């Protein structure tokens, strides 16, 4: 019996290939050119020497793409936090980001346990996964302490989008969550300039 030999995209080689390097460079360019600037009130571009309070659920848990068939396996995801820090920008909100990391990991654990429990009672375990898309938890309220050392605030609104996770006409999905609304109103009442970023694969009503 003859077998047809074929090449596949998977690899066990830990070395980054020339192909990966080219694709990574192309993906970075596509991301840069795909950013849409809706409004700029003499804040952007941010100076690399600036002190920035980086806040919001997508700051260090940046959504890289879709889910389901829209997901891809890649070696590295660079978050907004990592990108800004690598550029030399001083991030002053590490306490807020650390607190959100704890909330995020706790939410992921609860989500995982729920799926594993439901999988025991269905014929196809994948159904338990598909019917329970992960929802990013809210962060703690932004306080005066979080912005006291900042020259600029960058607040990131993120939404998970993709197969099985379309926008819903609810707060925290298509609409801002109550937490996001309160945070933005609080920040707007202060004298520090604000940059609002939307990190989502679908529309969000502001």
Task: Please annotate each region the language model reported.
Residues 1-206:
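C-terminal non-catalytic regions of proteins with extracellular/luminal or membrane-system context
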